[in-house]
Design a protein with these regions (language model features):
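Short amphipathic, positively biased membrane-proximal segments
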Residues: 1-183
Length: 183
């Protein structure tokens, strides 16, 4: 069980570290999956990373329609917070920054929650990863208009997305646990 006194702050720090490591690991998993499945190297993309309209790279398609949810979020932040319109060359790194920031912060919240409700760490974080997938990719991203609805994607996209988030959840928990033992 637990070999330390609960501390929300220490849990949050451990979770932030776990979330960052998990975001990187998820990114690497997605890059490998994509290379195997399609022979490309595009990474950091589950359903939230799919264009909201049309298909990838369709001729004549507006580039704004091809932007994934992380790029769309980065564009809104850049414009509304910094007064800067993202250039085409800035979109990929800005989208990756959103991916890592969201994954890191989510990990921090998970780490804090693990301190007060240790049951969330059950099954090495896999239920956490599945829940994160469901709430983020399947519900929130479409509701915010950042991607099409879940029924617009083939089952293979959902499998890819769920597998990616299971990798995230497992890595977040194992990393959080290791860091928390040190704190």
């Amino acid at each position: 069980m637990r070999d330390h006194e609960p501390s929300i702050w220490k849990g949050m720090i451990a979770g932030l570290a776990g979330g960052l490591v998990a975001s990187w690991t998820m990114n690497q998993f997605q890059a490998a999956w994509t290379r195997i499945a399609e022979g490309t190297e595009k990474s950091h993309g589950a359903q939230s990373m799919q264009p909201s309209e049309g298909s990838h790279g369709e001729q004549g398609q507006d580039t704004a329609e091809q932007d994934d949810a992380t790029v769309k979020t980065a564009k809104v932040i850049s414009k509304n917070v910094f007064g800067h319109e993202l250039q085409e060359s800035e979109k990929e790194p800005a989208g990756a920054a959103v991916h890592y920031a969201f994954g890191t912060v989510t990990g921090g919240l998970y780490g804090a929650l693990a301190e007060v409700t240790p049951q969330v760490t059950t099954a090495a974080g896999l239920p956490f990863g599945a829940g994160f997938w469901l709430l983020a990719d399947e519900v929130s991203v479409p509701l915010l208009g950042l991607s099409k609805g879940p029924t617009a994607y083939p089952v293979s996209t959902h499998v890819y997305s769920l597998a990616s988030h299971l990798v995230y959840g497992l890595t977040a928990e194992l990393s959080r646990r290791a860091v928390r033992q040190v704190l």
